[in-house]
């Protein structure tokens, strides 16, 4: 049985302390814990609670060159991660990011009609989908989510 994500959970997973904090620079700038699949240091976590539901972070991607930030989570069901109900979350653009991609974004988009984050986002989703341990049941995010299939 596939876990059903609520709109509220997906909305909260798309917020700063969650998906954006997969980028260590953002998390430090905002005073949040760094969201990572393998926390090794103080100030790092692999658990997100949204609308009372616990989620385990299984993968993150923060690409400095394009500003893409994303994560993949599994809901905790009966005390265990449900790897057959993975949600992949893509962050929107962080206007406070030191990555300045305005000019390069415009050039790439003009020539390809694609966001420069598209290839990074697409590759991230494919990595999760190609892992036999996981089944992606939900994609969520802002502008990049519409491009990922």
Q: Where do the PLM segments sit?
A:
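N-terminal low-complexity, Ser/Thr- and acidic-residue-enriched intrinsically disordered segments
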Residues: 1-32
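A conserved cap/lid and substrate-binding interface adjacent to the catalytic center
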Residues: 24, 30, 36-143, 147
